[in-house]
Amino acid sequence: MNITLLKSKIHRASVTEARLDYIGSISIDEKLLQASGILEYEKVQVVNVNNGARFETYTIATQEEGVVCLNGAAARLAEVGDKVIIMSYADFNEEEAKTFKPKVVFVDENNTATKITNYEKHGAIF
């Protein structure tokens, strides 16, 4: 039996751009992708903290520092300045799942990583 777990998370990033006319995806600062362990073209779930919208797309790495840009149809689901949580998931067998810990990246208002951990404590905001 396989179990799907949170693999990686970029927590409360600020949307810096929304480009409706661009081919669909989410462009993310490559430093954030590397810090989180999310790969370019990996499927991600994006949750908009401001309006509750949830959607899936794939990532595109950008060398532009601090960029989190929603592209294509996803651009209708957030406004510049909205806070989003970007998550990827992976399948594990039962034994792997018992010991796996996700990588969680906390960012500041400029989308610069401030803390990287593999643990989230309920009720704590880093």
Swiss-Prot record:
Pfam families: Asp_decarbox (PF02261). GO terms for biological process: alanine biosynthetic process; pantothenate biosynthetic process. Substrate binds at T57, G72, A73, A74. The keyword Lyase applies. Its main location: cytoplasm. Its EC number is 4.1.1.11. Its cofactor is pyruvate. One of its GO terms (cellular component) is cytosol. One of its GO terms (molecular function) is aspartate 1-decarboxylase activity. Is synthesized initially as an inactive proenzyme, which is activated by self-cleavage at a specific serine bond to produce a beta-subunit with a hydroxyl group at its C-terminus and an alpha-subunit with a pyruvoyl group at its N-terminus. The modification Pyruvic acid (Ser) is found at S25. Keywords: Autocatalytic cleavage, Cytoplasm, Decarboxylase, Lyase, Pantothenate biosynthesis, Pyruvate, Schiff base, Zymogen. It is an enzyme of class 4 (lyase). Pathway: Cofactor biosynthesis; (R)-pantothenate biosynthesis; beta-alanine from L-aspartate: step 1/1. SUPFAM superfamilies: ADC-like. Binds 1 pyruvoyl group covalently per subunit. The keyword Cytoplasm applies. Heterooctamer of four alpha and four beta subunits. Catalyzes the pyruvoyl-dependent decarboxylation of aspartate to produce beta-alanine. NCBIfam families: panD. Belongs to the PanD family. This is Aspartate 1-decarboxylase. It comes from Campylobacter jejuni subsp. jejuni serotype O:2 (strain ATCC 700819 / NCTC 11168).
